[in-house]
Amino acid sequence: CFLGNCPDS
């Protein structure tokens, strides 16, 4: 996750 960006991986 990066700055709340958690796609699927």
Curated annotation (Swiss-Prot):
Keyword Secreted carried by entry: yes
GO cellular component: extracellular region
Superkingdom as given in the UniProt entry: Eukaryota
Secreted found in the keyword field: yes
Locations listed in the record: Secreted
GO molecular function: toxin activity
Intrachain disulfide bonds: C1-C6
Keywords assigned by UniProt, alphabetized: Amidation, Disulfide bond, G-protein coupled receptor impairing toxin, Secreted, Toxin
Chain positions found as Serine amide: S9
Changes after translation: It is unsure whether Ser-9 is amidated or not, it is why the two forms have been synthesized. The non-amidated form shows a weaker agonist activity on the zebrafish vasopressin-2 receptor (V2R) (EC(50)=3.6 uM). The state of the C-terminal residue does not impact its 3D-structure.
Site feature location: Non-basic residue surely responsible of very weak activity: D8
Tissue specificity: Expressed by the venom duct.
Signal sequence segment: none
Free-text note on domains in this protein's UniProt record: The cysteine framework is C-C.
Family: Belongs to the vasopressin/oxytocin family.
Role, per record: Shows reduced activity vasopressin-oxytocin related receptors. Is active on fish receptors, but not on their human counterpart, supporting an evolved role of this conopressin in the envenomation process. Shows weak agonist activity on the zebrafish vasopressin-2 receptor (V2R) (EC(50)=1.72 uM). Has no effect on all other receptors tested.
Protein name: Conopressin-M2
Organism whose genome encodes this protein: Conus miliaris
